[in-house]
Amino acid sequence: MSKHIVIVGGGVGGTILANQLVSKLYPEILRDEVKITLLSESPDHFYKPAFMYVAFNLFFQEELKRPERSLLRPEITFRVDPVTRFDFAGQSLHTRSGKRLGYDFLVIATGCVPAPERIEGLKEAGDHFYQYQPARQLAQRLSRIEKGRVFITVSFPQTPNVPHQCGIAPVET
């Protein structure tokens, strides 16, 4: 019976891991001893490190988007079907379409999502470029500045050592 590796998350981490696993386990995959499935919320893959440049009108959405399937080796089963529930004890998960998927090995590579509302006043007073729409909004706000200063910060008042999506981005801007 073949082993089933399920990766949840079609971002950079999930995509790279799925492809690397195929490279490492290729003989086992050919012998049908291993199968790899990648589940994602979207059929598209966005190059998120460039969202910083969206804020300066240097890139736009279509330039940063590729079909996820085009980035994956053909041996990977790719499904656009977000996970709604994990059953760790039963080694299975449930998806939005109502499917139940069993696994032998599970990787959760869903990335992180900015939550500026968790810092009082930040959502109202600040912007970020870690998602496409907020980066476009920041570009519009920056284009209206005629004079003054722009303040860039990375702040975690409760947990100062918590990593975030792109640690170097504030330095690059």
Model-derived features: where do they sit?
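Beta1-alpha1 glycine-rich phosphate/pyrophosphate-binding loop at the start
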Residues: 2-77, 158-173
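FAD-binding core/adjacent interface of flavoenzyme oxidoreductases
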Residues: 1-3, 76-169
